[in-house]
């Protein structure tokens, strides 16, 4: 929650695609009069891609220091705070390709909730041509 600024729903047309970008970078969008990159988070994490037939996107705006990103996701169900003692290592629980982008995971009944590491997402080599 420390890095989350807002969860919003935006029309697909509000994202302007940019040429020669990795597939996970959808393009640029306007958020509160600021131009920010929109990222297809499932694509970036090698998960199931967004439904291309959508008319609107669910976006989670994150800020890490001075960097703002719009993380586009399939669905936003809500937010939950967890006690630190409930957070477990994701190693062995999820695909190894996801681990660098996670702070941990929480086991809840029949599902594993993944806690994203916003700093790791922003600093990902996938998003930078350095």
What is each of the regions a protein language model found here?
Residues 1-130:
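An acidic, low-aromatic, low-complexity terminal/linker signal
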């Amino acid at each position: 929650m420390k890095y989350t600024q807002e969860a919003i729903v935006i029309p697909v047309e509000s994202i302007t695609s940019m040429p020669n970008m990795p597939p996970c970078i959808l393009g640029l969008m306007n958020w509160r009069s600021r131009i920010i990159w929109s990222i297809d988070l499932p694509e970036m994490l090698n998960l199931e891609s967004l439904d291309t037939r959508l008319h609107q996107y669910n976006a989670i705006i994150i800020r890490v220091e001075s960097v703002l990103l719009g993380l586009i996701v399939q669905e936003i169900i809500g937010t939950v705070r967890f006690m630190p003692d409930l957070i477990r290592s994701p190693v062995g629980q999820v695909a190894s390709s996801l681990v660098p982008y996670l702070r941990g995971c929480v086991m809840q009944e029949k599902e594993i909730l993944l806690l994203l590491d916003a700093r790791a997402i922003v600093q990902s080599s996938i998003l930078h041509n350095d």
